[in-house]
């Protein structure tokens, strides 16, 4: 497929003149006014205009620029009020916050200071590939089988999907133009020739599912280190951003449609889960939580809330446990074999300052940056809410809120500790780690004297 693409759409080099990019609010009129201000300043220095004349024009221009900025960002916040990503981009732009990608000149790793980009790339690759295994190795062995926590009997199995050329072409057209793959393949070319590419991809996908195999060429991820905060020579202060091939995204999107339909139609997903689901959002989760808190306060009861955070939850998913849970929920046969192969023998490499590291094998976690990863994680964590008998739970993917209500605060605390112990045992069994540094509790009460 890649050879066919390269022969049909060879890369050609063309030199173009790139104009300097300006802020969106910077109009041609404002640019002319800025030049006019600079000229007035020179004239003031030469004594041909008064300081008052220059000052009046400078203040006038400052007001124009301030108004232009206000109008620009007001337009953004109005047009994209339902698009949180765009809103935060605008906020970060206003604050001057930008992600630092590969800006560091050196890296401290294993008591050494690395300066060569190729060495830094290898260090990032080793660091990112060892985070999850190190977390997993610190967990003690638990004798409880994960299947003991599973509820329900699912005798019927998920049907093996068969897609048409139209289905594949529709998926291709729906792909985000801003998200490219890792093989120098132009998404715009594929989208403009969607039906041409859909024909072989339809055959390949149907054969892939029927044989229970996922193409090995689609299992490699490119990792880019993105600086979060803190010293930029510490690898702990970087977030790995993963990119997969465009064809992998097409295959995964096709499978995701069938998988979600099956999970939702069979009511498999826990109703307390609000993450990555149709017609569910953080607003709904917050609404449920708020109503329960207000209802308890009206009864003069107290509410103890525990906000639980997992350490690298998506990256530490145990593949064998996940596959067994999928089998329990009716995902069997060639489809289950397809998911097994999808998770097996995945590779990743890191790119820093144009230098590519060697590849490393990934044996834990759902693939980062993938289409299927979030849905697979929902399956993995699906049985967690059935643990609790005294506490209510609200989940948004890996973020869990437990809360207990009642008139007696001491009893609430006792019940909460009991529920947390059950959660601890579940985590040991399912190889997940609670991040105690980011796990908090909050007490809602009208009582004057607290516990």
Residue ranges, per PLM feature:
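Secondary-structure edge/capping motif, primarily at the C-terminal ends of alpha-helices
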Residues: 37-48, 404
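Short, conserved micro-motifs composed of acidic
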Residues: 158, 354, 418, 433-451
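A glycine-rich phosphate-binding loop feature that marks nucleotide/adenosyl-phosphate handling sites
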Residues: 78-81, 145, 222, 435-447
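Basic/polar low-complexity segments
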Residues: 3-23, 46-163
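Active-site palm subdomain of RNA-directed nucleic acid polymerases
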Residues: 255-273, 298, 374-404
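Catalytic palm active-site di-aspartate
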Residues: 181, 220-223, 239, 273, ...
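Conserved pre-catalytic core of RNA-dependent polymerases
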Residues: 128, 154-366
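Catalytic palm subdomain of template-directed nucleic-acid polymerases
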Residues: 312-329, 401-425
């Amino acid at each position: 497929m890649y050879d066919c693409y390269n022969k049909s759409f060879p890369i050609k080099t063309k030199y173009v003149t790139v104009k300097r990019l300006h802020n969106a609010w910077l109009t041609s009129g404002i640019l002319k006014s800025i030049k006019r201000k600079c000229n007035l300043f020179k004239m003031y220095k030469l004594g041909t205009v008064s300081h008052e004349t220059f000052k009046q024009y400078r203040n006038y221009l400052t007001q124009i620029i301030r108004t232009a900025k206000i109008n620009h960002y007001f337009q953004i916040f109005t047009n994209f009020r339902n698009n949180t990503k765009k809103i935060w981009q605008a906020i970060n732009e206003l604050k001057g916050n930008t992600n630092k990608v590969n800006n560091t000149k050196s890296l401290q790793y294993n008591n050494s200071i690395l300066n060569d980009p190729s060495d830094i790339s290898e260090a990032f690759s080793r660091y990112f590939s060892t985070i999850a295994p190190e977390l997993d190795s610190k967990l003690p062995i638990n004798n409880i089988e994960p299947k003991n926590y599973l509820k329900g009997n699912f005798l019927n199995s998920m049907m093996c999907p068969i897609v048409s050329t139209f289905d594949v072409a529709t998926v291709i057209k729906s792909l985000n133009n801003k998200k490219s793959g890792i093989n120098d393949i132009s998404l715009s070319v594929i989208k403009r020739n969607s039906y041409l590419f859909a024909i072989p991809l339809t055959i390949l996908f149907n054969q892939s599912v029927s044989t229970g195999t996922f193409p090995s060429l689609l299992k490699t991820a490119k990792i880019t280190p993105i600086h979060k905060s803190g010293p930029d020579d510490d690898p702990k202060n970087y977030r790995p951003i993963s990119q997969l091939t465009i064809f992998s995204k097409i295959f995964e999107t096709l499978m995701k449609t069938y998988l979600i339909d099956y999970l939702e139609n069979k009511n498999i997903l826990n109703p307390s889960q609000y993450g990555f689901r149709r017609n569910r959002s953080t607003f709904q989760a917050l609404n449920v939580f708020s109503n329960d808190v207000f209802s308890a306060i009206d009864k003069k009861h107290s509410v103890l809330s525990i906000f639980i955070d997992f350490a690298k939850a998506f990256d530490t998913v145990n593949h064998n446990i996940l596959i067994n849970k999928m089998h329990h929920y009716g995902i069997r046969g060639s489809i289950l074999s397809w998911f097994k192969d999808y998770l097996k023998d995945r590779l990743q490499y890191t790119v820093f300052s144009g230098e590519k590291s060697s590849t490393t094998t990934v044996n834990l976690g759902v693939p980062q940056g993938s289409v299927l990863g979030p849905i697979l994680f929902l399956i993995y964590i699906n049985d967690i809410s059935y643990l609790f008998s005294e506490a209510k739970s609200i989940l948004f993917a890996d973020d869990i809120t437990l809360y207990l209500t009642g008139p007696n605060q001491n009893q609430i605390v006792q019940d909460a500790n009991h529920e947390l112990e059950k959660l601890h045992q579940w985590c040991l069994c399912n190889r997940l780690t609670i991040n105690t540094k980011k796990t908090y509790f909050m007490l809602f009460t009208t009582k004057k004297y607290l516990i």
